Amino acid sequence: AGVPFNTKTPYGPT
């Protein structure tokens, strides 16, 4: 992805 949607990981699983 390109936007931080997860609080644990900045960008989550891309």
Swiss-Prot record:
What is an annotated GO biological process for this record, any one? cellulose catabolic process
Q: Which reaction does it catalyse?
A: Endohydrolysis of (1->4)-beta-D-glucosidic linkages in cellulose, lichenin and cereal beta-D-glucans
Query: What is the uppermost EC class here?
Result: hydrolase
UniProtKB keywords: Carbohydrate metabolism, Cellulose degradation, Glycosidase, Hydrolase, Polysaccharide degradation
E.C. code? 3.2.1.4
Which one of the record's GO molecular function terms can you name? cellulase activity
Report the function annotation for this chain. This enzyme catalyzes the endohydrolysis of 1,4-beta-glucosidic linkages in cellulose, lichenin and cereal beta-D-glucans.
| Family per record | Belongs to the glycosyl hydrolase 8 (cellulase D) family.
What is the name of this protein? Endoglucanase A
